[in-house]
């Protein structure tokens, strides 16, 4: 049994004017957070852990700056990144006894200045 072509079922869907209105609204909507997020590469690097492997020991005299990144949704572990005076960056084990001593020395020297 076949239906005549004039009586074929019509598939319900949005009308042409509704589609045009939605397209116009989409074009007029500012991108919002995407515009202020910065380069795509910066966004992508924040979605994973920074440290893939850690260095067990570094001479404390070669450390120029220490950065501590707390655990969060992007990485489940605390990460410590040391910027060395020669320009290299290395990841350190936050549980290493030598690192705890280095951090304590930094905190103590900061307290002496105050």
Curated annotation (Swiss-Prot):
Q: Where in the cell is it found?
A: Secreted
Q: Where is the signal peptide?
A: 1-37
What are the UniProt keywords, alphabetically?
Answer: Antibiotic, Antimicrobial, Chemotaxis, Cytokine, Disulfide bond, Heparin-binding, Secreted, Signal
SS bond list? 49-75, 51-91
Q: Where is it predominantly found? A: secreted
PROSITE patterns according to UniProt: SMALL_CYTOKINES_CXC
Keyword Disulfide bond among record annotations: yes
Which GO cellular component terms are attached? extracellular region; extracellular space
CDD domains named in the record:
Chemokine_CXC
Give the molecular function GO annotations: chemokine activity; CXCR chemokine receptor binding; heparin binding
- Which GO biological process categories is it annotated with? antibacterial innate immune response; antimicrobial humoral immune response mediated by antimicrobial peptide; cell-cell signaling; cellular response to lipopolysaccharide; chemokine-mediated signaling pathway; chemotaxis; inflammatory response; leukocyte homeostasis
Check the record and name the InterPro entries matching this protein. Chemokine_b/g/d, Chemokine_CXC, Chemokine_CXC_CS, Chemokine_IL8-like_dom, CXC_Chemokine_domain, Interleukin_8-like_sf
Q: Which family does it belong to?
A: Belongs to the intercrine alpha (chemokine CxC) family.
Q: What does this protein do?
A: Chemotactic for neutrophil granulocytes. Signals through binding and activation of its receptors (CXCR1 and CXCR2). In addition to its chemotactic and angiogenic properties, it has strong antibacterial activity against Gram-positive and Gram-negative bacteria (90-fold-higher when compared to CXCL5 and CXCL7).
Q: What is this protein called?
A: C-X-C motif chemokine 6
Organism field: Homo sapiens
